């Protein structure tokens, strides 16, 4: 069409006063074109005006327009014999000065005047049309009247208005121009409806325009029969939309049409969008509708000025194409009916079986009974419809509209008059009872007109009605009637499609006119215009796939082409103004002929599947550039005339690069390739002295390409062509060397100063292949790409206004509620907003004060009370805050979602809790479930999308995408999980939607019900009546009623219908007497016996549960039936214990306010509550066990003679094994050997084997905690006989989540310490797989001889005694506690030592500061070890242990080899420590010249031999008291720290097992949580500081009191298992694990005390194990706090936070989610038995460390000083170095020592000066310098006092490693201080 219409060369708009574009020389300008006051254009240009020829005699009438055009302009007045459809629209008159009322012009003897042509003066005419631009006449004023008879003559060689006079009303002509019948077959006419390439002359278009003009004037023209005037205008509109804007001037009537749209735009521009939308939906004026579209789109494009709602409205309006086709609906219905009939009859493969199924589904008998019992009353209709809905399972669907339908429909049917029925009957009978069909009745014409209006949207004109009449009149028979109906259907479809195409054309015109830089001036407007054009293009494209639109495809393709031009233009404009991703450029340099160009194309193929674009710099224009992903520039530096350096710099840049192009359509083309490959023959493309050398070499990678085969051939065969064998297809013939950064040659890189470029040698090149080079380029481009664009609507904002002192409380409460309900809102303190409004984000909630100027929905907080977690239900946060919020506001605040987000990557931490789970079998299942998420409009859009997919399956993807973009989601919060065959989809919606899609099966059960959600209904109690508006009370009442009705509506309607039905057959008896209006009394309740009542009361009292009687009976019934859920197992345990202690209860009378009562009082003490493993049930299948089965190295398979597996046996040491009796029945074989000496104890079997496993397990009789796979097990540990498939077995019943199978019998159950206490003997099978039968271990004396040569001091036959709660046993080897101290007062401070904050620890009974004896102090320190701390529950601890192990696997090697001999392991130990309870003195005292003495060697050999068998060693320690400085307050109460001296044999075995693991952990302290091994006086502190500065995270510094004594044994056991995970799991490792997990024994003064809990400070690897314990307990506390708050932890918690742990010192860096529950975390730690405190040991609450305050860790304060990041030692720790000296042992510490080691003392104080220098010059000079000068003088030291700057420089040298650290400063780096024990607190 564009080619055809481009033939039109006449430019329209003579009314604008412009000279026509082209006139023939022999045709002067007609006189009627001259205005009443001459408009002399030519005279202005220096030419004489040309007058018209005298032959022009006919009077030209004004251009008529359709009747719906009502122009509103007031500047130009048209008059004459206007058609009747021209209605006046304005009475405004433009007057520009006194002018004559009329003027005349003589033209060849013919007088032309206003009167001659029947033109009315402006002040009389009301028909105002299109305005003209103002022009200046001779007097400079606008003429008052315009005599314009025909404004179109200047546009054509032969004016269509003039030629229309020779056209008769019937379309015939006088022969000068073709008739209408001939016009319809010309290319001019056909080109308007097709894309033909035939030539169309201007005369043909003129003739067509003449007929269209006549059709507008005369209704009898044949064009009006075939087309309405609206259609005729539509033809021109289609042409206008398809032609480029620059060529639209060539179209007829274009300027008038444009002026009409402009006028309409001015009239409606300021109207609201709703009014403009009415114009789009109701107006039949296409000019008005096109103007409306332009207004809507213009406001959308300028959304920055008119608001984002204008853009959203326009985007939605563009998609609402009214394509509803009644004809297609009828056809789809008929086709569906036929398909169903065919499926039931013809295509059904099993008709015999299908018909019975169909009969069963129809339920004909019941249906017949329902129909027979139907009554024609309202009640009858209700009963019948409800029965039908109940019969076919549609009660819930029909329940909401059945009552309305019954009432209104029944009344409507009853009120229908019989007269109307008889009239309709007579018409039908008159038509169909005759011998032939009679459609001449006007009734059928009315029906046809109504159908036409319903289908096309327009009332048909006379021509269309004539077609209807002709079609219906010819229907004289059945066949003719069918044909007539088909003809009408086809005609209706065509008219409907024409209207759709016209509508699309109007939108396209509006968009193309907006593609103007004067309108879209900024980049935001360009972006909006492009998006709208893309939306409209997708809509047009979707219609091209409609088979019924095939005739209009050429027009639709032209519309798409016009929109593509708009999109491409916007893309170019954006590209010029938008930052782009810099491409990756590489230069291949090398000699000619080596294969660079071929390698470049091969590299391009590896980078992209597209063919590369080619650019040559030898030409100055780049029209041939195609913009593909890879661009190749061959020999880019070959021309000296080209500034190729600047070209490359501009090309490899983030700023857009506009290419120089010659073609107009390529103007503005930018460079868009991702990768640039250039070749060059020069080693240095740009000289290093060039000003652009730095920018050039920084942007490119240079690869030197060499071909050794080619070089050798050329040197050996000069002048000969290189053969092909020098090249290989895999490019192995090339050697690629990648240079470093900024290399201008192979040897040198650029000098940044630019002075001497040969001063910096280049690093050696990297040898690389083409594949590696391609991968490197891809990675580099991915790194460069880092920008994303999101779009969504406005996000709601809420504010809670409170007092300043209440902000933290309100914030914490809202944070807790957010975590409890999985809310989506963003929470802030104050007005500052930190979260980005990306798609999927939630509402913004601010906690603000009354002074803040808040814009949003604000709620005043009347009171603030922080609720506990169990009370966070319903509207608790509203009650706690005293705010009045509607449920709608609560839902919006909690779950609002911005926009639509589709996530392909599923993160379990982001998934919401399900409310509905739907299994998708058909598309109807999904559609039915989606209705919950949608509004009514959204449901209609869903139906429409499904309908389109059914009609056009090819458009499914486009339709679904459009539906997702345009659908309206409900304002309610709904979460649905769709389980489909191909995967799982989770959809969450509330205003917007978030969707997660995965190909895996993901079952997430359970969600927050409406009653338990954050809404829960408003509770008005306590809010005060004045704070609650009446509207809110009424709304809440109606909401409550609706909730109640939604719960009971189904049952209510069914029961009501049943009541109506029963009332039919029930005689009604009138009640009489007193019983009238009364009924029998109904007693409801449960009767209990006295014993049951007592049990119920006792259960409520002991368990503190609010149980009703009904709940109690149901719970008791479930427990009696053997249910294995949590409550039933607990009740069963409680009830059995109650039966055992029944006689410990006594009935006591109690007198109180309520009078005399009797209660059961328990006489015996209540046993402490054990670990409850049911409080936190979890899906243990989600994570694997660390090492499979527990103690797997000591487990061996039991097989039958034929090799069939039967069960397992466990080695308990020295060749003794345990298993089960039914496992050993028959000919059992273990390790190919028969068991010997079998001893049976119940079901347990103990036996011997000659084959001894290298590992053995410890055994005991405690209660099991874990099953064989490490999962928690629940059991009451009560034994009885159970009937099994193998006979009666004596054991206990337990519950575990592990699935067992045949052959698992004999696997071990263990307690907290990993001790085997029972064996697996059976399960509940498929009916109850969680039930397990456990056979307990029974000790059997197998006379196992102890192999240890040194008898343990605790293995004596002396009785056990109790001393102050400690269980002890005499050892017979008394060891006294060392008395006295080595700490003395310095001679410099004999008089003022009391000023020091620390003193030597208490010396015992003779010490006046504290008279407590050393034995008393020792016993007091052992008291906390008598009870084990509870620690976390086993289930949570197991999960966290697996998380920590998984986290550590990232930086700790998996397998560490065990040391093979004891001597090597011994040399791994610190030889300055004691040897333990068996041998005295230090380890180094037993080593001379590298040889161990006999006592030590014998002890190590005996221990090592036992450890090689995997047996546990005696876990014993020598106890002592630490000689150290202590704070005065602790000295006064006798507090000293214990020293646990571990047995040297145990230390050696543990070093062999775990030393290498601990070294790996210490070496990677910068990557992990454990900071053991860190140097706090080195660069490692900077790494800590960087980790502390993690954005949007809170920092907590925590210390703990009595850390060692509060360590739970099961946590220590888990830490040891983690260490074992990273070993080779040898017998030595098993022995070390079993030893360290056993209870420690401390020995002093000849007494051995066995402790129950805690972790000895001298335990091997104590720092590592303490740190692991720290991580495990913090992780368990965090997991428990989150899950108590409603956040299900399904991810590795250690991936979400950072920790610094060194024993009891900890720093926690946590995100906001965890920070919100940190108070609960610390509460959980206290429940575990720990005592967390602040680092200053105060009792204040532990709060986050502000960002501007330093963090304390390891008694250091980490700060940034002018010298860098430093860890400052406490000032008091430095100062007390000067007060005390370590020397000989004494009991009079106030007397200075007799001899001072001056070198060591001088080094100590020198180090103190270095540390003090980091605190600043003032502290150093005023406090430290006087102290050290005094010490030098009075202590006789020989050192020079360093000045401040010297001390700073020395410490910096040690810190940075430029100078070696002295021994003492290196020792202090572990956090203990400069001189070991002196600095310890």
Swiss-Prot record:
The modification O-(5'-phospho-RNA)-tyrosine is found at residue 1093. The active site is at residues 1222, 1243, 1305. It comes from the Viruses. GO terms for cellular component: host cell endoplasmic reticulum membrane; membrane. Residues 564-720 form the SF3 helicase domain. Pfam families: Peptidase_C24, RdRP_1, RNA_helicase, VPg. The record marks 148-149, 435-436, 791-792, 1070-1071, 1183-1184 as: Cleavage. One of its GO terms (molecular function) is RNA binding. GO terms for biological process: DNA-templated transcription; proteolysis; viral RNA genome replication. Keywords: ATP-binding, Covalent protein-RNA linkage, Host endoplasmic reticulum, Host membrane, Hydrolase, Membrane, Nucleotide-binding, Nucleotidyltransferase, Phosphoprotein, Protease, RNA-directed RNA polymerase, Thiol protease, Transferase, Viral RNA replication. Residues 1188-1341 form the Peptidase C24 domain. Residues 1593-1718 form the RdRp catalytic domain. Residues 1-16 have a biased composition (Polar residues). Residues 1-93 are annotated as: Disordered. This is Genome polyprotein. It comes from Vesicular exanthema of swine virus serotype A48 (isolate Swine/United States/A48/1948). The lineage of its organism: Viruses, Riboviria, Orthornavirae, Pisuviricota, Pisoniviricetes.
């Amino acid at each position: 069409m564009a080619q055809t219409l481009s033939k039109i060369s006449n430019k329209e708009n003579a009314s604008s006063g412009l000279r026509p574009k082209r006139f023939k020389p022999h045709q002067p300008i007609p006189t009627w074109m001259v205005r009443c006051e001459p408009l002399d254009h030519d005279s202005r240009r220096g030419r004489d005006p040309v007058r018209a020829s005298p032959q022009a005699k006919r009077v030209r009438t004004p251009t008529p327009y359709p009747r719906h055009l009502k122009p509103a302009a007031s500047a130009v007045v048209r008059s004459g014999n206007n058609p009747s459809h021209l209605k006046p629209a304005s009475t405004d008159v433009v007057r520009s000065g006194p002018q004559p009322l009329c003027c005349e012009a003589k033209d060849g003897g013919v007088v032309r005047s206003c009167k001659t042509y029947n033109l009315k003066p402006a002040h009389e005419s009301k028909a105002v049309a299109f305005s003209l631009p103002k022009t200046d006449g001779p007097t400079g004023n606008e003429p008052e009247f315009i005599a314009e008879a025909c404004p179109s003559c200047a546009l054509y060689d032969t004016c269509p208005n003039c030629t229309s006079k020779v056209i008769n009303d019937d379309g015939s002509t006088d022969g000068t121009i073709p008739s209408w019948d001939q016009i319809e077959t010309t290319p001019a006419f056909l080109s308007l409806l097709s894309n033909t390439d035939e030539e169309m002359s201007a005369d043909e278009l003129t003739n067509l325009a003449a007929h269209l003009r006549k059709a507008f004037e005369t209704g009898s023209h044949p064009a009006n029969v075939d087309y309405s005037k609206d259609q005729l205008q539509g033809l021109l509109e289609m042409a206008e939309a398809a032609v480029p804007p620059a060529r639209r001037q060539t179209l007829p009537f274009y300027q008038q049409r444009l002026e009409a749209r402009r006028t309409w735009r001015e009239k409606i521009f300021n109207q609201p969008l709703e009014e403009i939308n009415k114009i789009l939906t109701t107006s039949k004026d296409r000019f008005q509708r096109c103007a409306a579209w332009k207004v809507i789109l213009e406001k959308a494009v300028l959304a920055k000025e008119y608001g984002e709602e204008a853009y959203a409205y326009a985007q939605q309006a563009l998609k609402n194409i009214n394509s509803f086709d009644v004809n297609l609906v009828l056809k789809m219905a008929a086709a569906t009916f036929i398909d169903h009939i065919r499926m039931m009859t013809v295509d059904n493969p099993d008709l015999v079986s299908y018909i019975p199924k169909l009969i069963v589904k129809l339920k004909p008998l019941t249906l017949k009974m329902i129909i027979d019992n139907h009554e024609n009353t309202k009640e009858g209709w209700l009963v019948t419809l409800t029965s039908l809905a109940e019969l076919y399972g549609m009660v819930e669907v029909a329940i909401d509209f059945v009552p309305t339908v019954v009432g209104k429909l029944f009344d409507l049917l009853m009120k229908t008059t019989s007269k109307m029925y008889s009239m309709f009957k007579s018409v039908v009978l008159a038509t169909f009872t005759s011998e032939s069909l009679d459609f001449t009745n006007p009734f059928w014409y009315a029906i046809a007109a109504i159908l036409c209006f319903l289908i096309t949207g327009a009332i048909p004109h006379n021509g269309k009605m004539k077609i209807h009449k002709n079609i219906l009149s010819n229907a004289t028979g059945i066949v003719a009637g069918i044909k007539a109906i088909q003809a009408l259907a086809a005609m209706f479809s065509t008219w409907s499609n024409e209207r759709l195409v016209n509508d699309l054309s109007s939108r396209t015109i509006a968009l193309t006119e907006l593609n103007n830089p004067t309108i879209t001036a900024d980049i935001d407007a360009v972006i909006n215009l492009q998006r709208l054009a893309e939306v409209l293009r997708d809509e047009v494209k979707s219609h091209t796939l409609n088979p019924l639109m095939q005739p209009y495809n050429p027009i639709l393709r032209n519309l798409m082409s016009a929109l593509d031009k708009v999109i491409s233009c916007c893309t170019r404009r954006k590209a010029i103004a938008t930052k782009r991703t810099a491409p990756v450029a590489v230069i291949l340099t090398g000699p000619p002929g080596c294969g660079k160009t071929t390698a470049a194309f091969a590299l391009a193929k590896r980078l992209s599947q597209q063919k590369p674009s080619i650019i040559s710099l030898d030409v100055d224009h780049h029209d041939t550039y195609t913009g593909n992903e890879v661009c190749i520039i061959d020999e880019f530096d070959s021309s000296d005339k080209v500034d190729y350096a600047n070209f490359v710099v501009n090309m490899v840049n983030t700023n857009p690069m506009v290419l120089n192009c010659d073609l107009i359509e390529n103007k503005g083309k930018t460079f868009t390739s991702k990768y640039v490959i250039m070749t060059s023959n020069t080693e240095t493309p740009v000289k290093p002295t060039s000003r652009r050398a730095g920018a050039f070499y920084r942007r490119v990678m240079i690869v030197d390409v060499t071909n050794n085969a080619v070089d050798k051939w050329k040197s050996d065969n000069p002048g000969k062509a290189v053969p092909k064998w020098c090249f290989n297809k895999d490019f192995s013939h090339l050697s690629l060397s990648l240079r470093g950064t900024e290399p201008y040659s192979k040897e040198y890189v650029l000098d940044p100063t630019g002075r001497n470029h040969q001063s910096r040698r280049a690093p050696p090149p990297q040898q690389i292949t083409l594949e590696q080079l391609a991968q490197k380029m891809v990675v580099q481009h991915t790194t460069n790409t880092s920008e994303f664009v999101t779009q969504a609507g406005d996000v709601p904002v809420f504010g809670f206004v409170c007092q300043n002192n209440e902000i933290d409380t309100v914030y914490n409460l809202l944070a807790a509620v957010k975590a409890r309900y999985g809310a989506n809102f963003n929470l802030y303190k104050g007005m500052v907003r930190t979260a980005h409004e990306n798609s999927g984000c939630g509402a913004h909630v601010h906690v603000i004060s009354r002074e803040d100027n808040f814009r949003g929905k604000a709620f005043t907080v009347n009171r603030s009370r922080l609720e506990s977690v169990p009370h966070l239900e319903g509207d608790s946060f509203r009650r706690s805050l005293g705010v009045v919020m509607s449920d709608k506001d609560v839902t919006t605040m909690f779950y609002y979602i911005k926009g639509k987000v589709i996530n392909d990557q599923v993160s379990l931490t982001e998934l919401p809790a399900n409310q509905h789970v739907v299994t998708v079998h058909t598309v109807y299942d999904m559609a039915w479930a989606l209705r919950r998420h949608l509004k009514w409009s959204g449901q209609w859009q869903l139906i429409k999308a499904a309908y389109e997919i059914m009609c056009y399956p090819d458009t499914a993807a486009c339709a679904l995408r459009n539906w997702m973009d345009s659908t309206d989601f409900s304002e309610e919060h709904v979460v649905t999980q769709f389980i489909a065959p191909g995967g799982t989809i989770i959809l969450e919606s509330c205003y917007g939607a978030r969707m997660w899609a995965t190909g895996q099966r993901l079952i997430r059960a359970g969600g927050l019900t409406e009653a338990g959600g954050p809404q829960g209904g408003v509770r008005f109690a306590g809010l005060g009546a004045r704070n609650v508006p009446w509207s809110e009370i009424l709304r809440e009442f109606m909401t409550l009623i609706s909730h109640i009705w939604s719960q009971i509506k189904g049952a209510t309607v069914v029961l009501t219908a049943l009541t109506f039905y029963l009332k039919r057959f029930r005689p009604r008896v009138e009640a009489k007497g007193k019983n009238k209006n009364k009924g029998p009394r109904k007693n409801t309740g449960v009767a209990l016996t006295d014993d049951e009542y007592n049990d119920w009361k006792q259960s409520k009292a002991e368990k503190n549960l609010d149980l009703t009687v009904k709940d109690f009976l149901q719970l008791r019934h479930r427990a009696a039936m053997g249910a294995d859920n949590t409550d039933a197992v607990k009740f069963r345990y409680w009830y059995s214990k109650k039966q055992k202690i029944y006689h410990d209860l006594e009935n006591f009378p109690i007198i109180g306010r309520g009078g005399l009562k009797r209660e059961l009082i328990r006489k015996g003490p209540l046993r402490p509550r054990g670990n409850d493993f049911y409080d936190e049930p979890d899906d243990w299948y989600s994570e694997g066990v660390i090492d499979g089965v527990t103690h797997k190295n000591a487990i061996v398979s039991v097989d039958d003679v034929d090799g069939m597996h039967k069960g397992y046996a466990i080695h308990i040491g020295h060749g003794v094994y345990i298993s089960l009796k039914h496992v050993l029945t028959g000919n059992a074989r273990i390790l190919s050997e028969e068991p010997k000496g079998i001893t049976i104890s119940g079901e347990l079997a103990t036996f011997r084997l000659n084959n001894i496993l290298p590992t053995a397990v410890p055994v005991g009789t405690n209660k099991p905690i874990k099953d064989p796979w490490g999962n928690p097990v629940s059991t009451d540990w009560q034994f009885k006989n159970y009937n099994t498939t193998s006979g009666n077995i004596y054991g206990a019943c337990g519950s575990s989540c592990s699935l067992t199978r045949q052959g698992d019998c004999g696997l071990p159950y263990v307690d907290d310490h990993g001790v085997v206490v029972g064996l697996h003997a059976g399960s509940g099978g498929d009916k109850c797989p969680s039930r397990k039968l456990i056979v307990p271990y029974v000790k059997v004396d197998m006379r196992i001889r102890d192999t240890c040569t040194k008898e343990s001091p605790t293995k004596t036959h002396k009785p056990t005694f109790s001393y102050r709660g400690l269980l002890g046993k005499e050892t017979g080897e008394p060891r006294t506690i060392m008395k006295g101290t080595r700490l003395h007062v310095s001679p410099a401070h004999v008089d003022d030592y009391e000023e020091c904050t620390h003193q030597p620890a208490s010396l015992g009974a003779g010490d006046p500061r504290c008279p407590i004896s050393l034995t008393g102090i020792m016993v007091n320190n052992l008291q906390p070890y008598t009870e084990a701390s509870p620690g976390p529950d086993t289930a949570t601890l197991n999960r966290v242990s697996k998380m920590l192990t998984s986290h550590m696997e990232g930086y700790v090697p998996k397998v560490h080899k065990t040391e093979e001999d004891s001597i090597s392991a011994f040399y791994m130990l610190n030889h300055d420590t004691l040897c333990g309870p068996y041998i005295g003195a230090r380890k180094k005292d037993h080593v001379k010249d590298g040889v161990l003495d006999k006592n030590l060697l014998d002890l190590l050999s005996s221990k090592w031999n036992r450890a090689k068998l995997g047996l546990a060693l005696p876990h014993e320690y020598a106890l002592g008291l630490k000689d150290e400085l202590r704070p005065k307050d602790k000295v006064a109460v006798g507090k000293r720290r214990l020293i646990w001296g571990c047995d040297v044999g145990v230390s050696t075995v543990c070093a062999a097992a775990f030393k290498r693991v601990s070294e790996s952990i210490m070496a990677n302290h910068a990557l992990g949580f454990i900071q053991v091994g860190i140097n706090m006086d080195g660069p490692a502190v900077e790494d800590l500081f960087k980790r502390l500065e993690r954005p949007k995270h809170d920092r907590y510094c925590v210390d703990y009191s009595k850390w060692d004594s509060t360590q739970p044994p099961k946590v220590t056991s888990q830490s040891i298992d983690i260490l074992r995970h990273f070993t080779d799991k040898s017998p030595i490792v098993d022995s070390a694990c079993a030893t360290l997990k056993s209870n420690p024994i401390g020995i002093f003064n000849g007494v051995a005390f066995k402790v129950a809990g805690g972790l000895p400070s001298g335990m091997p690897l104590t720092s590592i194990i303490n740190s692991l314990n720290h991580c495990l307990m913090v992780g368990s506390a965090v997991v428990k706090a989150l899950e108590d708050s409603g956040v299900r932890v399904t991810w590795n918690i250690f991936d979400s936070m950072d920790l610094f742990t060194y024993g009891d010192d900890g720093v926690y860096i946590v995100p906001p989610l965890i920070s919100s529950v940190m108070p609960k975390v610390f509460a959980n730690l206290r429940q575990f038995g720990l005592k967390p405190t602040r680092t200053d040991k105060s009792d204040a609450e532990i709060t986050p460390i502000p960002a501007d305050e330093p963090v304390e860790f390891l008694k250091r304060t980490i700060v940034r000083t002018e010298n860098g990041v430093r860890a400052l030692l406490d000032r008091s720790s430095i100062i007390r170095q000067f007060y005390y000296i370590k020397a000989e042992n004494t009991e009079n510490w106030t007397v200075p020592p007799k001899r001072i080691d001056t070198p060591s003392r001088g080094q100590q104080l020198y180090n103190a000066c270095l540390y003090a220098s980091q605190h600043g010059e003032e502290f150093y000079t005023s406090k430290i310098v006087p102290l050290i000068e005094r010490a030098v003088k009075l202590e006789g030291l020989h050192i020079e006092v360093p000045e401040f700057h010297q001390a700073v420089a020395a410490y910096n040298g040690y810190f940075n490693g430029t100078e070696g650290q002295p021994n003492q400063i290196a020792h202090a780096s572990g956090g203990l201080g400069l001189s070991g024990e002196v600095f310890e607190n």
